[in-house]
Structures are given as C-alpha cells and as structure tokens.
C-alpha cells in the first residue's frame, strides 16, 4: 500500500521539480538582465518579456502530466499557483498579447513598446517547446512521466463541441474574464484572486470544449502545428476570437483612451499644472 501510494505521487514530484527548474532558470536570467542591461530604451523590457514568456509557456507543457494523473481539481490549483508565481517573479512581463493589444488600441502603449513586447512574446512562444523537450530528455532516466513525454512527438487536438460553440466559447470566455479581472482589480483585497479566476475559466474550458485558449501566446506555444486544426482556423480561434472578446470586455468596463478624457479630468489637470507653476 505504501509503495502504491509513493508511486502515485511520482508524477507530481516530477512536475514540481520541472516547475522549480524552469522558474529558477528564469529568475537567474532576470537577475543577470537587471544587472547588465540598462532599463533605458526597450532592451530590458524585451528581455524580461522574452524570459517570462519562455518560462510560462514551458510550464504549460508540464500541465498535461498534472491533468493526466490527478484530474480537474489538480490542474485548477496548478495553473492558479503558476500564474500567482508568475505575477511575483516576472518583473511585470505580461506573457499574453491580449492586454498589450488593449493598451495599444486604447492609446495607452506606444507602437515601439507594443512591437517590442509582442516580438518578445512570439519569440518566447517559439522556443518554449524546445526547452520543454530538452528538460524532458535530460530528466527522462529519472521520471517515467518525462520519458513518456519526451518520446511522444505527436500532437492531436480533440474538441468536445462543434466549431461554432468552440468559437463562441473563446470570444465570450475572454470577454467575461476581462470583466472579472476589472472587478477584482477594483478591490485591492481581491487582486490575489485573479489567477484563480483565470484558472477557473481554463479548467471550465478544458471540461466543456476540450482545448482551452484565452491566451494567444500560450496557445501558439503549445498548440500551433498540432493535428486537428488548420493554420487559418488556428489564428481565427486562438488569436482573433480571444483578442476580440478581451477588447470588447475592456470597452465595456470603461477603458479610456488618453485622447478621450472627460471635461472634468481636463479641468483637474489644468488646475494641477497651475498649482505646480505657482509653487515654482
């Protein structure tokens, strides 16, 4: 009984070691970046985003082990904790293109920084699979779960619903998540629940649809090139749909462009400038 019990937790130990290694390497890379790369310009911003994206997308590859061996409750907790850890360690890296599209569209992010962040995310998504398989191959002699993953190069997407429902789920899901995030951000005591809210949606999508999206960068890293969906459908489903839902949610919660300030805001700014001049 004791032997069976210990074997049951072997995949968990493998996953925890994997996550610790990925975050450890990521943190070392961030420390080196902070020490040797100037915060002036976009170089440090690019590297932080690149490191964070590789780190988070590489961790997504290991989530399959958690779900396969421990089911929905475990994957919910796992994703929530990974997102929480990302918020702590990632130095502000977004690792998701939907928020930067939002900031750019509403005029809160310049084109230079927008392209810097987006290019870092795309490059990071490209390299995530290589890092995941590298770790699996190195640790395969010590982990049956990693040995199985390292030897399995086939990726097939299985959807539980029709195309229309899957598309609707992506749009509505991103819309709802954006609104929920806004509500939690408005209450400082509840901000820490944001990763759990996102994880709850992803777990629900996994149960209902079979292949969750929400984050186009993560979807690209993990799902692009898999059998079961062509390239055009992939970009519609995992890029256009979630970004559309996210931007719609941002519009509903009142994301404002700097060029569309209210008369009250403009008046307050003028008073502040006048007061500043008097103090000079």
Swiss-Prot record:
Gene Ontology molecular function terms on file: channel activity
Encoding gene per record: aqp-10
Extracellular side: 30-64, 136-164, 215-233
Main location: membrane
Region ranges (Disordered): 256-280
Subcellular location: Membrane
Residues on Cytoplasmic side: 1-8, 86-114, 186-193, 255-280
Keywords: Membrane, Transmembrane, Transmembrane helix
Coiled coil: none
Superkingdom of source: Eukaryota
Basic and acidic residues: bias regions: 262-280
Gene Ontology terms describing biological process: innate immune response
Identification of the protein by name: Putative aquaporin-10
Record's GO cellular component terms: cytoplasm; membrane
Chain ranges passing through the membrane: 9-29, 65-85, 115-135, 165-185, 194-214, 234-254
Membrane topology listed for this record: Multi-pass membrane protein
Family listed: Belongs to the MIP/aquaporin (TC 1.A.8) family.
